[in-house]
Amino acid sequence: MKVIVFDTETNGLNNCSVLSISAIKLEVEGKKAKEIGKFERYYFPEPGEKYDEEAIKVNGLTEEVLQKNKSSNEPKYFKEDKEFVNFCKDTDHYVAHSIAFDKKFLPFEIKNEFCTKQIGKKTMEVDEKTKNEYRWPRLSHAAKYYNVPMDESKWHGASYDTKICLEIFKGMLKDPNVKEYMNDFLKETNIKKNSFVR
């Protein structure tokens, strides 16, 4: 089964542009996941949209950084990038660490989603309880739990965060505490029903 692990970096939190996206396509069989494709690009804010200073503090994606990393033969804006849609056409299963946020920016509906943060809250029992509940695990908490090496200087880059999320997902594939959630996620669906924007 094909699964896509992805992450976005955006120009704010709501009603804003995608500045960077990274997606890794996997072939998942049992407890094994093999990388079979990758998509990674940078984009500019939509016309008339100013750079969000608070977002820059998190992701560091200034206009200069985007100019440096952007290829001139690629679409300027994420909404114009049909190649990303094509990259995603053969799967209906998506993984992200905060998928409720990231999926808002995709140009199609996700049918099957797996949130490593949400599942992690149920299985990792991260310390520092709030309101008698375990806290949501950050990407770094989940990485530490599954013994994934980290470089904190690279956090909040779509490419690096996707790679870390991928390794966490691989760990979860083998985790008996996640088996029930994983089985539900990996059920077969009809790809033709995916609501892609063309």
Give the residues covered by each predicted segment.
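Acidic, Mg2+-coordinating catalytic module of metal-dependent nucleases/exonucleases
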Residues: 93-100, 104-105, 138-198
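Conserved non-catalytic scaffold segment of RNase H-like nuclease domains
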Residues: 2-110, 133-146, 152
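Ser/Thr-centric signal marking residues that sit
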Residues: 8-11, 116, 165
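Short aromatic-enriched loop/helix-cap "lid" or pocket-rim segments at secondary-structure transitions
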Residues: 51-54, 125-126, 193-194
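Short alpha-helix plus adjacent loop in nuclease-associated cores
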Residues: 114-134
